[in-house]
Amino acid sequence: MNFSMEVCGMYVPFRASLLPFGGEHIFPKEENLRLFLENNKTIGIYAYPVEQIAAEHLLPIVKQLELLQDMEHYQKLYEILSKYPLEGRKVQESLGALCRKDHVKCSALVWESLSGYGTYTYMEKKWKSLLRKVKKKEPAWQEVHGLICRFLEPIWEKLMEDQIFFGDWMPQLGRFLD
């Protein structure tokens, strides 16, 4: 939805998205935004945790593998991993719950398949098709796939071993801090 608001006699456009949420037992957290043009007045907004959103994009990726038709899951996940710090434990808990609910087995075979897609021309063609659709030229498929694999590998290993993962994702570094 596109909105505009008037601040100091100027109209400021902004966009808000409302996405359906299919998860359970997830509560929005409050975030405060500072309005610089309004004497640093703050407003509160409620948003679902970015860890849950990341897990919801990971589920179709690990469930459907190369049969995934909607490459937007890769795009959205790449955007999240590039911008937001994440708590690995929360992503692991959310992804584990979603996998159990959808009967997705956390196995080495799934990881081997997924990790090999960096050089898989079929997936690269699907990625380039998405980029044309959204009128972008980058990032390259190998960059997107590499970032997602660096993020998912330690989480997936702990899911397979039924252990808890402790690590904080740092988007500036493109890796976890353990």
Please place each PLM-identified region on the residue numbering:
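Structured mid-to-C-terminal alpha-helical surface segments
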Residues: 1-178
